[in-house]
Each structure stands twice: as structure tokens, then as C-alpha cells.
Amino acid sequence: MARIAGVDIPRDKRVVISLTYIYGIGKATAQKILAEAGVSEDTRVRDLTEEELGKIREIVDRLKVEGDLRREVSLNIKRLMEIGCYRGLRHRRGLPVRGQNTKNNARTRKGPRRTVANKKK
């Protein structure tokens, strides 16, 4: 397995798919990385030369991925909660942040149901 940005990427998959195993790199970013490195998207990871791997590593190192990106996202959420804006309050209460309805759904964000006794009359 090749190791890029501290992540073992699968050897048997195409490079463009393997790069998406790194947090912060999606398909579009992976395609841009490979275009800049001059590597074909159809190449398998096991067929990459050390030189090509080095180019890819160099490009990925310039991006904010994995731990740095996770840290930045969590700090952004913390900042929203500290300044007390609407989005911060929604994060603090564990409710959907982006305006979704909460009357019926939002179970992922709200957690399992907590039924209240004697609700029906």
C-alpha cells in the first residue's frame, strides 16, 4: 500500500479513486491533483513509479487535508458556538444547522426518540 498524507491508499484501485480515501480529497480534487502531476487517472496505484508518487505526495502536502482540515472544521464550529450566532446555537443544541424541518425528521441530528408520557388525549 502506498502512503500519502498519513493514509494507506489501496493498491488495486485506480489512482483517482484511491486518492478519495484521504479526508478532504474528493473526486474533483483528485482529478486536479493527477492532472497537475501528469499522471493518467486510469493508472492503478500499484503501477505508479516512485517519481509519480513523489509528485502526488508533494501536491497533496500543499492542500489542507486529514488532521489539519478536521481541526479547522471543529474550530470553525467552536467559533460559531462561542459568538452565539443562530448556527452556533443549532450546533450547541444538536439540531440541524441548515434550515431543515425538525417537526417530523432530523433523527440523525437529534438522536433516538425520547417519548413523552401522556402526550395523546
Swiss-Prot record:
NCBIfam families: uS13_bact. Keywords: Ribonucleoprotein, Ribosomal protein, RNA-binding, rRNA-binding, tRNA-binding. Located at the top of the head of the 30S subunit, it contacts several helices of the 16S rRNA. In the 70S ribosome it contacts the 23S rRNA (bridge B1a) and protein L5 of the 50S subunit (bridge B1b), connecting the 2 subunits; these bridges are implicated in subunit movement. Contacts the tRNAs in the A and P-sites. HAMAP family: Ribosomal_uS13. This is Small ribosomal subunit protein uS13. GO terms for cellular component: cytosol; small ribosomal subunit. PROSITE patterns: RIBOSOMAL_S13_1, RIBOSOMAL_S13_2. Belongs to the universal ribosomal protein uS13 family. InterPro entries: Rbsml_uS13_C, Ribosomal_uS13, Ribosomal_uS13-like_H2TH, Ribosomal_uS13_bac-type, Ribosomal_uS13_CS. Signal peptide: none annotated. Pfam families: Ribosomal_S13. Residues 106-121 have a biased composition (Basic residues).
